[in-house]
């Protein structure tokens, strides 16, 4: 059950005067108690950041995509910690790329910055390197940029929890893309809100495995290009070198040490004599980073992105790939802890039944690019309590039920017998999973 739905007030047992860098009501009593047992490395990082950027990061509450990256017209409602699931080509990665693209468009549209506000340009031409696709036509649903005499508008609109909205529409005349604001009301953004957006950026971490055996020094522009191209594992040492030069490598090392017996020990590069960046980790003795295990490297990459990029919204694409089940659970633990202690939003895409079964059903959100509205299970009123009553229904069952859309969970009118409700709901769920027809009922 979602702890926010507890009958007790979240945070009610917190000692007076305690300081929190995330809202206790957002995560519930259990999460708060866990966070107070000892200060985590993430929490230490959050305290340090609060000295320079006291305002908390933004959280996305609504994403609308129309005629873009395979989406016809869908509105997605993510939570603070959301595990996105769905079939191949359902749109999980496309959704993440679209959100990242919206951030790019916001920066491109900045016309001028004033003391109290930032003014956006109504329209901009977009160069190919700015697009999240190899070819311009790939941005549009089925590559259709024109119908008859009308150019088709590809649209992205995002709403944040504080009411801020931004929206962009793209057209593709003459083989290139142009962008315009969807509404003139989006032209002016209060300065303090814009600064929060840029201080805590949206960061997309593509799926990757391991590291390359040798890594050359890269320029910042080349690093961004490789990450955008899904080759983040090729620049991990470069990011660690940046942190070493900034005096922040210890932040990564401290987090890693909480989860593994070894941690990052040394990062070095001398331009006059070195061709490659050297990174070692210490576990009894020093070892080259290339010899580390897959789980260590995956967690190291995620933590490095969290420290280096300072995201307010972290989007992670299949971080479980090729990992043992226990390491998949560890990745979820690290991301959930980061969300809680750093106060950031995490969107995680996965195919892993291990992860689906490990997380709370309320954290699941099934992505289907052909559906009009996409909400997490926790946003469907009453669904969690009914699922709880089923006992043996786990998150994998919940995912299959949602994905098939064959289950109608309803209150048992006039019944005060929980076991009766559970029995009827269980029978409905069995019929739901086995049925191949019937109405497509939603919660």
Say what each PLM segment does.
Residues 71, 159-163, 261, 282-284:
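Glycine-centered tight beta-turn/hairpin loop motif at sheet-sheet or coil-to-beta transitions
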Residues 70, 90, 208-212, 414-415:
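Short, solvent-exposed loop/turn segments at secondary-structure junctions
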Residues 119-122, 127, 167-261, 268-269:
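Coupling/switch segment of ABC-type P-loop NTPase heads
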Residues 198-202, 311, 360-362, 404, ...:
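Short glycine-/polar-rich loops that comprise or flank the Walker A/P-loop
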Residues 208, 350-353, 412:
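A short beta-strand-to-loop transition that corresponds to the Sensor-1 phosphate-sensing loop
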Residues 98-165, 268:
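Conserved P-loop NTP-binding catalytic core
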Residues 1-110, 255-256, 266-400:
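Switch/communication elements of ASCE P-loop NTPase nucleotide-binding domains
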Residues 404-443:
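Conserved helicase/translocase motor-coupling segment
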């Amino acid at each position: 059950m979602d702890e926010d739905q507890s009958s007790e007030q979240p945070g009610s047992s917190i000692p007076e005067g305690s300081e929190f860098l995330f809202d206790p009501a957002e995560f519930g009593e259990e999460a708060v108690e866990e966070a107070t047992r000892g200060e985590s490395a993430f929490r230490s990082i959050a305290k340090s950041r609060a000295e320079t950027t006291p305002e908390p990061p933004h959280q996305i509450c609504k994403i609308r995509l129309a005629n873009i990256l395979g989406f016809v017209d869908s509105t997605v409602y993510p939570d603070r910690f959301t595990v996105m699931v769905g079939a191949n080509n359902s749109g999980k990665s496309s959704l993440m790329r679209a959100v990242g693209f919206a951030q790019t468009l916001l920066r491109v549209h900045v016309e001028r910055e004033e003391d109290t506000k930032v003014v956006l340009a109504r329209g901009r031409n977009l160069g190919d390197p700015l697009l999240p696709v190899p070819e311009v036509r790939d941005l549009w649903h089925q590559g259709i940029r024109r119908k008859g005499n009308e150019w088709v508008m590809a649209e992205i609109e995002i709403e944040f929890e504080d009411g801020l909205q931004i929206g962009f529409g793209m057209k593709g005349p003459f083989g290139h893309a142009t962008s315009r604001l969807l509404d003139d009301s989006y032209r002016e953004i209060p300065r303090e809100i814009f600064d929060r957006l840029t201080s805590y950026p949206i960061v997309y971490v593509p799926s990757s495995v391991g590291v390359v055996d040798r890594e050359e020094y890269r320029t910042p522009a080349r690093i961004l290009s490789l990450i955008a191209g899904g080759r983040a594992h090729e620049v991990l040492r470069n990011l660690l070198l940046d942190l070493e030069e900034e005096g922040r490598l210890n932040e990564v090392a401290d987090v890693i040490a909480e989860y593994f017996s070894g941690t990052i020990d040394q990062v070095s590069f001398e331009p006059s004599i070195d061709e490659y960046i050297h990174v070692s980790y210490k576990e009894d003795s020093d070892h080259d980073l290339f010899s580390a295990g897959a789980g260590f490297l995956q967690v190291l990459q995620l933590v490095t992105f969290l420290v280096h990029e300072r995201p307010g919204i972290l989007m992670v694409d299949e971080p479980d790939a090729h990992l043992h089940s226990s390491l998949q659970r560890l990745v979820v633990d690290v991301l959930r802890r980061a969300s809680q202690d750093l106060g950031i939003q995490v969107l995680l895409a996965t195919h892993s039944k291990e992860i689906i079964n490990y997380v709370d059903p309320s954290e699941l959100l099934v992505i289907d690019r052909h559906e009009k509205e996409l909400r997490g299970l926790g946003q469907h009123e009453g669904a969690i309590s009914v699922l709880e009553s089923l006992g043996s229904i786990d998150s994998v069952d919940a995912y299959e039920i949602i994905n098939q859309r064959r289950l109608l969970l309803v209150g048992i009118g006039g019944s005060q017998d929980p076991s009766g409700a559970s029995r009827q709901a269980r029978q409905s769920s069995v019929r739901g999973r086995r049925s191949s027809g019937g109405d497509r009922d939603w919660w």
